[in-house]
Amino acid sequence: MLNTFKKVTASYLSAAYILIRETMRYKCNYCTYNEYIKNLALNFSRENIFFIKFFQAVCTTSHPLLTDDVSQYLNTFTDNAPYTDSEIDVESLERLMQEYSIEIKTPFVPIKSGAISLIFEGTLTSEKEKESVIIKCKRVGIDDKIQDAIFNMNHLISFTKIVPHIKNLNVHDIYNENKQSIVDQLSFHIEVRNIELFYSKWSKPGLDYIKIPKVYSEITQQIPNVIVMERIVGNTIYNIDPEDKDRYANLLAKFNFKSVFYDSVYHGDIHPGNVFFIKELKTKSHASIDDDDDSNDDSNDDSSDNNDSNNSNDTNPDMNNNNNNDFKKYRYKLGIIDFGIVGKFSREMQNTIFHLFKGLYEKNHDVVAHCIIDNLVEPKDALTNEKKNELIGIISKYSENHFGKETHRFLDAEDIIKINKILYGFGVQFSKEFCKIELSFAISDSVCKLLTNKTTYIDQLLTIFSKYS
């Protein structure tokens, strides 16, 4: 007990020291504001890797203290987390080179550094060809670091239940419901199965606008600390042409629509580093095929997945309805990577999200309120009929004030925080199942906002929704 107390106290004191030191440096003009925030992110992540996810979620909210430079830094921070040479699993990488004819540049230098893994480039040589591959390799000692991080965060998060202004943000439940997702990322066997699942959903005719990497599962079976997969080449979200954003927003909307309402799964970590934006110049043969596809009906979509659908729709979203000259010239695709966090919807949750989205689209604010109160809050028996009706009225009014304007939008991170404050005042909060989805929505929101141009991501999603709802 004494050792536990010392360990937790040491962790808190270290975090406090980092905060005080960096704040004093900023106040004494030793660094700019942007450098101050970046230094906090860097040093806190070294103290506890859960802070990486925290900073990732923070940048999904609009706040005057978050400058564009800081927001972009935090958005890309998960791909550039600090690491040391001792965390490179040299033994596994050398086995990979010796046993599977994979060339990796030495000395081993990662091209990206995530919280759990280091990413390397390589070339897989077979009898037929050479293929560029990506090697995802677990950091040495990361399992123990994750367990230590969970141990320390468990105590820190417990305090959020009693701190004013924080206790009603549902931080405790969001953390508890998502920490298992972090632990699951330690098992590359789980991630390989997730990649294969999404690959099977998107490697069918008519769905090639989404590129999922092919994974070499047999390698992970023999070397469990590595994943070898096809390399996807594309631009980052910060390097795409502004005029192309609407195209990509449309593709992302189709990806999420099909995943949620047809496949009953969702990618739990759609941050800017996990999406590649591909723009290919069409060949004559491709152009003629795609021109024909423009007039295709829904029969070209992934109808085989409809048997797994949990909603009443029986047609997948059409993927080629764009007819301007630029579309005729180029093929647009999204490359989706990193399937360490994948969630599955229950039938009830899938239907709830469908009706919630439909209520927001139709601006039926009573439906929105009933969806939230009847299906997304707990404990179920905490509300009397009188209190329930009162709360439904308040949420309906909130929906009218925030979603009743001409522009359409869905619940974002700030809405969830505000609504949860209202719920907390009535002795209820968002359900644990919804908490699993809540953080994923917040993280993906950063990508959606960055794709806003002439239209928004939500506008694109609503266009698809109106066609198939």
Predicted regions and their residues:
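Broad phosphate/nucleotide-binding scaffolds in NTP-utilizing and phosphate-metabolizing enzymes
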Residues: 1-257, 264, 277-288, 325-347, ...
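Catalytic-loop of the protein kinase fold
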Residues: 265-272
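Long, acidic low-complexity intrinsically disordered regions
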Residues: 289-322
